[in-house]
Amino acid sequence: MITTIPVGLGARAYDVVIGTGLIDRAGEHIAPLLKRKRVAIVTDTIVGEHHGERLANALEHAGVATDVILVPPGEETKSFEGLADLSDRLLALGLERGDMVIAFGGGVVGDLTGFAAAIYKRGIDFIQIPTTLLAQVDSSVGGKTAIDTPRGKNLIGAFHQPRLVLADLDILATLPARELACGYAEVIKYGLLGDFAFFEWLEANVHAVLERDTAALVKAVGRSVEMKAQIVAEDEREVGRRALLNLGHTFGHAVEGEMGFGDALKHGEAVGLGMAQAFRFSVRQGLCSAQDAARAEAAIKAAGLPTKLSDIRPEPFSADALIAHTAQDKKAQGGTLTFVLVRAIGDAFVAKDVDRQALRAFLVEEGAV
């Protein structure tokens, strides 16, 4: 079963192909896009060990010469050091502008490789082959590329659209359960921000998705990508509606920053927590019903995701430190705080100039000090 979803960006439009067996048929999808039959595959050591040879063989069978660059797994790779190392290795290979880079991995590999492609010789084409649920439904689509800095997540980056996204659902079979739950956080986000019917379907099918039922994954990934593709086509540079895709991310990134962007708290877990907090803060501000917030929280918790600060660690967080992280958020303008809040499940909006004292009081209620 193959589903193709177009991302309509005029001359830079591309397809997101979703289905099974796509890695083994990667050559037939990728070879026609190449000016010169040469690619560099960037992958981490874990994905490379499990699937790298399959992808390289599929490409070579289509007459494409391949080089493989291995990077360490984990968020720490998305750094200035990681970017410099990858850029140097691409230069050492002598890649030309007519060649292609393939990001074969999760969100970290996709973000890092996409940014390196954006700046390599002022821009080289790249393809996303996402290997995690989170990357398939979110980070591989839309052209956002970035690295982290000690001051925050994804603060240095560029918009650089891929030429193609291949989302092979078979590869999710080897994904650890924790990573699958992290991806589910981004799936349920789409229902919470703008599709109540999809949210209801997820309530009823969360276990089918997490048990990797193929039909459930086709629906979950397909609807998520449809929504993201539509929003990106309307607002590529996030000057308007695309900001809604950050539901849960401002709260979540703040907690990630305090936790050091490591494996103690993964990005999807932070987003799950952040969405629950966004609903509760919306209730506190008189924007959303407590019933909707409780229902959203229950749906997030059903996937085994954290919904409270105390789920992350027993020691309390500093409210002031969390607020300082939100001030570094990319949505912030004129020194004010900007959050994606909700009126109801399926009805999110961008709230500008959020009151710092109200936010601090809320975080104290949440257990911060």
UniProtKB/Swiss-Prot annotation:
Its cofactor is Co(2+); Zn(2+); NAD(+). Gene3D superfamilies: 3.40.50.1970, Dehydroquinate synthase-like - alpha domain (1.20.1090.10). It holds the Pfam family DHQ_synthase. It is an enzyme of class 4 (lyase). One of its GO terms (molecular function) is metal ion binding. It is found in: Cytoplasm. Keywords: Amino-acid biosynthesis, Aromatic amino acid biosynthesis, Cobalt, Cytoplasm, Lyase, Metal-binding, NAD, Nucleotide-binding, Zinc. Binds 1 divalent metal cation per subunit. Can use either Co(2+) or Zn(2+). GO terms for cellular component: cytoplasm. InterPro entries: Dehydroquinate_synthase (IPR050071), DHQ_synth_AroB (IPR016037), DHQ_synth_fam (IPR030963), DHQS/DOIS_N (IPR030960), DHQS_C (IPR056179). Pathway: Metabolic intermediate biosynthesis; chorismate biosynthesis; chorismate from D-erythrose 4-phosphate and phosphoenolpyruvate: step 2/7. CDD domains: DHQS. Signal peptide: none annotated. One of its GO terms (biological process) is aromatic amino acid family biosynthetic process. Zn(2+) binds at E186, H249, H267. Its EC number is 4.2.3.4. It catalyses: 7-phospho-2-dehydro-3-deoxy-D-arabino-heptonate = 3-dehydroquinate + phosphate. NAD(+) binds at G107, V108, V109, G110, D111, T131, T132, K144, K153. Catalyzes the conversion of 3-deoxy-D-arabino-heptulosonate 7-phosphate (DAHP) to dehydroquinate (DHQ). Belongs to the sugar phosphate cyclases superfamily. Dehydroquinate synthase family. PANTHER family: 3-DEHYDROQUINATE SYNTHASE (PTHR43622), 3-DEHYDROQUINATE SYNTHASE, CHLOROPLASTIC (PTHR43622:SF7). This is 3-dehydroquinate synthase. It comes from Caulobacter sp. (strain K31). The gene is aroB.
